[in-house]
Amino acid sequence: PGLGSGWGALSEYAVVCDPKAPWPGGAPDCAFAQTVLDDDLDPVDATMIVTFREVLSNIRYFGIQPQDSVVVFGCGPVGLTYLKFMSLLGVKDLVACDILPEKLEQARNYGATHLINSKECDVRAEVRKLFPGGVDYVLDAAGSPAIVNQGMGLIKDRGSVLCYGVPEKEEVTIDFSPADYNWRVIYQQMPRKREEGEAHAQVVEWMRSGELNIKDFISDYFTFDQAVEAYQKLLDRKILKKGIITF
């Protein structure tokens, strides 16, 4: 009682569960995402595997296929991971949108086939030039409710706007006047832990094959004494990729 083990959250202690143990009524959901790391994996950098597993399990849940076209809003570490993983899974039509030129240039190295600066141009016009009938998916990797409405004018009939993570507000007003007749909005605030655990093997396989370099997604390291500085840097948007606090 009073103890949890869903995530770290700077905890000093954690409860680790074994899903294969004979739990009365079955193992708790969190147990399926608690995976023992192989000895050759750096436990500091391996914190990035949490994002990797969440993203891969979300791609599977969303149902994105190699033949699909996807517009990704937000080229931070999460958006870059989506681009990289969809590229590894064979998706050829990947459009990256961001307001920062330096992040867009990064996106090209992670699988993006088209770059759009959403601050400098009309995103809908640019996307429709590339895909006159619209795209299959618009993915919000930035956590902005405005992207839901922006995406309505980008997707094809029966296309989907996909939202990953916790939105700024717990309500969204959807203006679907720019959309075709049929559309979907899917929110995935957190993947189920069993699905996250099932993604672990593929992530590690990509790492071992050299197709996925974990350090490509980390830009900053901080000691625990620098934790306040780290969070301030995050709030000031000065961490380009992932920042890790070491203990």
Regions found by a protein language model. Give the residues of each.
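C-terminal substrate-binding/catalytic core of Rossmann-like NAD(P)-dependent dehydrogenases/reductases
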Residues: A125-R128, P132, E170-D220, V228-E229
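Helix-to-beta-strand junctions that scaffold the AdoMet/dcAdoMet cofactor pocket
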Residues: I155-D157
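Glycine-centered, small-residue-biased loops immediately flanking beta-strands
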Residues: D68, G159-S160, W183
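Hydrophobic/small residue at the entry helix of a nucleotide-binding pocket
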Residues: E54, V78, M86
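C-terminal capping/lid region of NAD(P)-dependent oxidoreductase domains
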Residues: P132, L162, P167-E170, N213-F217, ...
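NAD(P)H dinucleotide-binding glycine-rich loop of Rossmann-like/cofactor-binding domains
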Residues: P1-S69, F73
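Glycine-rich helix-loop-beta junction characteristic of Rossmann-like nucleotide cofactor-binding loops
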Residues: R60-Q65, L130-P132, G153
